[in-house]
Amino acid sequence: MSFFKSSQPTIYIPDTLRNWPWPREINPHYEECKRESAAWVEKFGAFSAKAQKAFNKCDFNLLASLAWSRVNRDGCRIGCDLMNLFFVFDEWSDVSDAEETRRMADIIMDALYDPHKPRPTGEWVGGEVTRQYWLNAIRTATPSAQKRFIKAFKLYTDSVVQQSADRDKHLIRDIDSYFEVRRDTIGAKPSFAINEVHMNLPDYVMEHPVIKNLTAYCIDMLCIGNDLCSYNVEQSRGDDGHNLVTIVMHQLNLDVQGAFDWIGKLHDELVDKFLEEYKNVPTFKDKQVTKECAEYAFGLGNWVRGNDQWSFESERYFRKDGMRVLTERTVVLLPKKREPPPKPLDEDPIYSALPWWGWTALFGFLATAFTFSARQLSTRISANLIA
């Protein structure tokens, strides 16, 4: 039985992975790492109780354990923590303007560059989340993986700032320029650094044309898969400007189903390209490098499957209806919500951090403003009564 009951149109989601050879795999350390990572991120109080409950239903630890199904326990925990960090930033930036998102991005990167430095009192919580995440990760991550992760995470945070700027301007990009930004906002590049978290892959491997092509195809498939699954909830709350479905509808003058179908065909082309290129995964004189290169390439293919499975198995996009949608591929288009999305915290985080003298000044200003507004309102009411 469908979870959604409505007179709204029904959308068919293309079965993009019908020919994908990677099966569903889950890391054997999932349950243990989920408990630890969920408790870890919850202790920061980054969300209100209501928002935290919704956050937990998304089960980002499941995404990590599906995507990094073959890393060891340390790698699984690093992956779970990273997914939780990603979505702390994601949830906060979704309701912030570009200026505020830039401030948060700078805090994150400062914590990555120097995780041994204590974070300032009263700072946005993401700084301490990042610092603790990276302190744990660098205990076992190889130097090459650390270097690539930090470089990729800078691209990611910068792109999220750009996404906020686009949202501030109500900008709808064209398909090409959208992909330029989306390839970083998806967070795949730093995630792929966790594929190699305990490997020692030289730069010449990562710069090999085959590996670069596989990485590019994988990123685009992740962008498409995420946008197809997230579109319904995003459009319902008016936050679909950074979604390929909206971009395609706008540029190609298609309806929702037409855009889904067009995007499905694009994904089919990427599947064909990836599988053909996968036959050419390079070998090297160093047997260990060849082994790790093959494992890295396998991990790219597994990421596509893992991300898709999580989209349906978690409650982030389809609530409890995900497994039916995975099989039947249909969803009812949700009606538009009138209210804006809630802040991650019940209170405004800026006001909650004010010292006593800040509160005094704020209340003084509000009292003055209220008195002035009340006088204006009284004058207008009197004028209306006289008229």
From Swiss-Prot:
Chain sites annotated for binding Mg(2+) 1: D90
Highest taxon in the source lineage: Eukaryota
UniProt-recorded name of the protein: Delta(6)-protoilludene synthase
Native species: Cyclocybe aegerita
Example GO molecular function: metal ion binding
Catalytic activity: (2E,6E)-farnesyl diphosphate = Delta(6)-protoilludene + diphosphate
Residues under site feature: Plays a critical role in the stabilization of intermediate cation: F87
Residues that bind (2E,6E)-farnesyl diphosphate: R316, Y317
Keyword Metal-binding: yes
Main enzyme class: lyase
Free-text note on domains in this protein's UniProt record: The DDXXD motif is important for the catalytic activity, presumably through binding to Mg(2+).
GO BP, one annotated term: isoprenoid biosynthetic process
Protein role: Terpene cyclase that catalyzes the cyclization of farnesyl diphosphate (FPP) to delta(6)-protoilludene.
Key words, A-Z: Lyase, Magnesium, Metal-binding
UniProt-annotated binding residues for Mg(2+) 2: D90
Family as reported in the entry's similarity comment: Belongs to the terpene synthase family.
Motif position, DDXXD motif: 90-94
High-level lineage: Eukaryota, Fungi, Dikarya, Basidiomycota, Agaricomycotina
Chain positions recorded as Mg(2+) 3 binding sites: N226, S230, E234
Gene this protein is translated from: Agr7
Names of required cofactors: Mg(2+)
